[in-house]
Swiss-Prot record:
Domain PCI: 165-334
Source organism of this protein record: Mus musculus
Subunit: Component of the 19S proteasome regulatory particle complex. The 26S proteasome consists of a 20S core particle (CP) and two 19S regulatory subunits (RP). The regulatory particle is made of a lid composed of 9 subunits including PSMD8, a base containing 6 ATPases and few additional components. Interacts with DDI2. Interacts with TASOR.
PROSITE patterns per record: PCI (PS50250)
Protein family per UniProt: Belongs to the proteasome subunit S14 family.
Name by which UniProt lists this protein: 26S proteasome non-ATPase regulatory subunit 8
Cited InterPro entries: 26S_Psome_Rpn12, CSN8_PSD8_EIF3K, PCI_dom
GO cellular component, one term: proteasome accessory complex
């Protein structure tokens, strides 16, 4: 249809058709609207892009796993488990740090400050390995032995540093390995020595009830025959008997050098008890006699201890305690008041009957 010599316009959005020359031409689609994704070639392009992105992510993940496996195992084999590979890496790092600590500790004069820093770093690494086993954790034998060896060095380091609270913490952690895992782990060479030190520590702090509680956890054979356990048990018996001279003599028969620290604390405690009794029982005591009773080997040590206690040596070489003793009137018994209370109590009982 022609209007004024021109062909009629095809409505917008419809394909144009042509029959020039008697032949039908192919349908020509109009260009797509900008931003439209409804055309087939747009859908094909978006699908291709998604496939490329997926393949890229898979390739990156495979490369990352290969790098992790190469770092942990020293090869290009892909690790089968991410958490397992991490645990192996942490264990290897802890083992390397432990070897450094062990080398420093085994020196003739170890650097205690350096050992303390190494122990601090190792404890942080062990936290990632659950070095205190619980019911829900499953640790390998290698992990348990490594953690136990580190804690044993920590306990001995605490004694050399004279850090009693630190020693008590290390021993509380070691008991888990000594008692709960004694069937799964080989016996440690330092187990009896450290358990004996723990008993001596409780004895030096006058924690007798805890001493007997720990003693009950040990086999009877170890108590009777093991030299590390037998020594603190004998000291406790001497204290109960009041044989203080045997306690002082036992210092020269210690099973290990590390026992000296707690033995000295125990002897100082005993000296303080004896000195308190001297102040109550004697009005005055000769210098030589005080030196013998308090088990001092030299007069200088006796003089230093007397100054610490506030004792003053008189002109006749006597220590006088008359001013420190209670006056007779302070120790009188209120017999009249006690008699009245007893009579009143008897009267009330008679009324009840």
């Amino acid at each position: 249809m022609f209007i004024k010599g021109r062909a009629a316009k095809t409505p917008r959005g419809e394909p144009r058709r042509s029959s020039r020359g008697g032949r039908k031409l192919a349908v020509v689609a109009p260009p797509p609207v900008l931003g439209s994704t409804s055309r087939p070639h747009f859908r094909r392009e978006s699908i291709a892009r998604r496939r490329c992105r997926k393949s890229g992510r898979r390739l990156a993940a495979s490369r990352k796993m290969a790098a992790t496996a190469a770092t942990v195992n020293g090869s290009t084999t892909v690790s089968s488990s991410g958490p397992a590979a991490t645990s192996v890496g942490i264990l290897q790092a802890a083992a390397g740090m432990y070897e450094q600590l062990k080398d420093e500790w085994n020196r003739k004069n170890p650097n205690l400050s350096k050992c303390g820093e190494e122990l601090g770093r190792l404890k942080l690494v062990l936290l990632e390995l659950n070095f205190l086993p619980t019911t829900g954790t499953k640790l390998t034998k290698q992990q348990l032995i490594l953690a136990r060896d580190i804690l044993e060095i920590g306990a001995q380091w605490s004694i050399l540093c004279k850090d009693i609270p630190s020693f008590e913490r290390y021993m509380a952690q070691l008991k888990c390995y000594y008692f709960d895992y004694k069937e799964q782990l080989p016996e440690s060479a330092y187990m009896h020595q450290l358990l004996g030190l723990n008993l001596l520590f409780l004895l030096s702090q006058n924690r007798v009830a805890e001493f007997h509680t720990e003693l009950e956890r040990l086999p009877a054979k170890d108590i009777q025959t093991n030299v590390y356990i037998k020594h603190p048990v004998s000291l406790e018996q001497y204290l109960m008997e009041g044989s203080y001279n045997k306690v002082f003599l036992a210092k020269g028969n210690i099973p290990a050098e590390s026992y000296t620290f707690f033995i000295d604390i125990l002897l100082d405690t005993i000296r303080d008890e004896i000195a308190g009794c001297i102040e109550k029982a004697y009005e005055k005591i000769l210098f030589a006699e005080a030196t013998r009773i308090l088990f001092f080997s030299t007069p200088k040590k006796m003089t230093d201890y007397a100054k610490k206690r506030g004792w003053v040596l008189g002109p006749n070489n006597y220590y006088s305690f008359a001013s420190q003793q209670q006056k007779p009137e302070d120790s009188t018994i209120p017999s009249t008041e006690l008699a009245k209370q007893v009579i009143e109590y008897a009267r009330q009982l008679e009324m009840i009957v």
